[in-house]
């Protein structure tokens, strides 16, 4: 007589998490929990190990596209979607911890933070930061992703979040994937259009930053538009 015992592949890391806490688990163990199961060729620990060995750092994993995740051994479409959702949620939590409640003292300091967030993006991202009367960030919102043109950057959505979060002022930030930070004519027109809309609604447009690579451009510092 013999018996066959079956233990779910990722059960041990789950037990360790319950017993010791998530902070005590290795990156491989945490990733194994998220992946959940292996396949016919590899168990979940081997898949997690391969994924981690294919990137130079966890930051690189955060920047991977859905198709790049799905192209990894043992990762199908569903797991790739789940991983990207988890990565994005973690990124948003980190941004909330780093920004919300922080007082903005200079365009340079803010630009350095936004460079870390946006400089690696392959498309333009327009982000609005909403501040209270103490110049503390109370909300951050990605307005849209794509080329920044006057027709796309409608003030309506930007002001919607200002009203929703009871902000008193707004800072716009967008990236140039090329790395060049000099504003285009479209950038100037968008800035002027949104400034006028803010003034009509009683909000202050404090700045519009353009970030790319290791440099930035501040409309407040460089022009009289703001």
Swiss-Prot record:
Residues 103-225 form the MPN domain. One of its GO terms (biological process) is proteolysis. A motif (JAMM motif) lies at residues 174-187. Keywords: Hydrolase, Metal-binding, Metalloprotease, Protease, Zinc. InterPro entries: MPN (IPR037518), RadC_JAB (IPR025657), UPF0758 (IPR001405), UPF0758_CS (IPR020891), UPF0758_N (IPR046778). One of its GO terms (molecular function) is metal ion binding. CDD domains: MPN_DUF2466. Zn(2+) binds at residues 174, 176, 187. Belongs to the UPF0758 family. This is UPF0758 protein SGO_1229. It comes from Streptococcus gordonii (strain Challis / ATCC 35105 / BCRC 15272 / CH1 / DL1 / V288).
